[in-house]
Amino acid sequence: MAITTAASRLGVAPYNESRPVELRPDFSLDDAKMVIRAVYRQVLGNDYIMDSERLKGAESLLTNGSISVREFVRTVAKSELYKKKFLYNNFQTRVIELNYKHLLGRAPFSEDEVIFHLDLYENQGFDADIDSYIDSVEYQENFGENIVPYYRFNNQVGDRTVGFTRMFRLYRGYANSDRSQLERSSSRLATELGQNTVSAIVGPSGSNAGWAYRPSRAGNTPAKALGGTVPFGQASKLFRVEITAISAPGYPKVRRSNKAVIVPFEQLNQTLQQINRLGGKVASITPASLS
């Protein structure tokens, strides 16, 4: 899971190039302010926070050394501010996805983890569920008392490889907010976790020179020439090719939206060569026919 040359394309370069934020024993006022900003950014999913919404009492306790970073994280995650942003308006499975992302820096590994937190929330309430993340061995081993939680894109002992791919269904770029995504309150991983499958990584739109393609949520790609009765091409297979950044003579230099074409299998190689000659980039190739 190490991030190398693909970091900028995946939108994780800022995290790859920075160190975890820690409040050391001899911290200054500026150090405390930096930690407070980092906690708000992480736990509130990079959502904008007004000055009147800040938890001034908890901030003072942290600045005075009365509470640790872990307890400040706990206070923010249990606050009415957090509930208004992520609990009240979301399905519970989406809330669990966000709790994993905000507090443990990863995506859920399996449906069992989601079921565990669903049961805990139903039987003991939201605060107890938040405690289960922050009091976990996983949290303590990775962040301890004074490190601000961060997105864990690198492999660690006990991690599962599915976590890397699924994290990019939750993380949509450094400047993205968890409350400003197109899919809004719907769960990102419920289908994958229920079917025990993993989808391909689709990078943030800003790093792909346009919106990257995502297949239908229903998963019902039409068969045989996009639903027709007559197969198109010998193999009866069609592919949707999404193209971006064509820069050949005659094309305007202003930024353009992506272009998608439907190509039969036997013409796919020829089409890719033509795109390359025009200076374009292939954003995605996905089946448009199931037969």
UniProtKB/Swiss-Prot annotation:
Occurrences of domain PBS-linker (ranges): 2-179
InterPro entries per record: CpcD-like_dom, PBS_linker_dom, PBS_linker_sf, Phycobilisome
Principal location class: membrane
Subcellular location(s) of the protein: Cellular thylakoid membrane
Signal peptide from the UniProt entry: none
Entry-linked PROSITE patterns: CPCD_LIKE, PBS_LINKER
Domain of life, per lineage: Bacteria
Coiled coil location: none
Annotated ranges, domain CpcD-like: 236-288
Keywords: Antenna complex, Membrane, Photosynthesis, Phycobilisome, Thylakoid
Pfam family for this entry, one: PBS_linker_poly
GO biological process: photosynthesis
Disulphide-bonded residues: none
Cellular component per GO, a single term: phycobilisome
Keyword Membrane assigned: yes
Membrane topology note: Peripheral membrane protein
Protein family: Belongs to the phycobilisome linker protein family.
Function: Rod linker protein, connecting hexameric phycocyanin (PC, made by cpcA and cpcB) rods in the phycobilisome (PBS). PC is the major phycobiliprotein in PBS rods. Linker polypeptides determine the state of aggregation and the location of the disk-shaped phycobiliprotein units within the phycobilisome and modulate their spectroscopic properties in order to mediate a directed and optimal energy transfer.
UniProt subunit comment: Part of 2 PBS rod complexes, the conventional CpcG-PBS rod and a photosystem I-specific CpcL-PBS rod, both of which include ferredoxin--NADP reductase (petH). CpcG-PBS has on average 3 stacked phycocyanin hexamers (PC, CpcA and CpcB). Linker CpcG connects the PC stack to the thylakoid, the hexamers are linked by 1 copy of CpcC1, 1 copy of CpcC2 and the stack is terminated by a single copy of CpcD. The CpcL-PBS has on average 5 stacked phycocyanin hexamers (PC, CpcA and CpcB).
Protein name stated in the entry: Phycobilisome 32.1 kDa linker polypeptide, phycocyanin-associated, rod 1
Source organism: Synechocystis sp. (strain ATCC 27184 / PCC 6803 / Kazusa)
